[in-house]
């Protein structure tokens, strides 16, 4: 399980990071970068469901690992 710092090392450039906690587990998981899938990344014991970035803002959506 990767940590957030490991994930950010894969992302080139300077980013402001926003972690958005989802109230419900999303229906679909998937996506990734450089062979790393979002569901394989942990943010403080939470699982990442989606990562998007716009204008150097990295938005990380997470939900609790039940």
Regions found by a protein language model. Name each.
Residues 2-24:
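N-terminal acidic leader/helix
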Residues 19-66:
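Detector for the mature cores of small, proteolytically processed
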